[in-house]
């Protein structure tokens, strides 16, 4: 991703029966809102894919992870700064949440790049 400050990873699921509303909200509201936060320069959304390994005795295909959706946000400033601003905007209501987002399953983390010698 070519940034010196890393990425923010968000893993999520829709609430039961709300996949279409969740996808629409993510694409048209939430991701565009996050992209207005200083330090967030890009976003890519992903859906989990089943890994089917060839049949080998003693090796099974891994189970699907608990999260069905992932967003990778590229950052141009420290993740803690971006996370703090996201928190401020969520509390103030400037950043909207939607009933189709299952808040009990959210996974959120910031990742710093590994450079030689660290």
Language-model region placement:
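Macromolecular interaction modules
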Residues: 1-118
């Amino acid at each position: 991703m070519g940034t010196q400050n890393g990425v923010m990873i968000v893993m999520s699921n829709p609430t039961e029966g709300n996949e279409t509303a969740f996808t629409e909200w993510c694409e048209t509201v939430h991701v565009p809102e996050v992209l207005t936060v200083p330090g967030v320069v890009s976003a890519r959304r992903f859906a989990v894919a089943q890994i089917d390994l060839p049949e080998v005795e003693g090796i099974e295909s891994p189970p699907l992870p608990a999260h069905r959706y992932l967003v990778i946000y590229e950052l141009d400033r420290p993740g803690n700064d971006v996370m703090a601003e996201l928190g401020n905007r969520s509390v103030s209501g400037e950043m909207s949440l939607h009933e189709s987002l299952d808040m009990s399953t959210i996974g959120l983390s910031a990742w710093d790049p590994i450079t030689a010698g660290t």
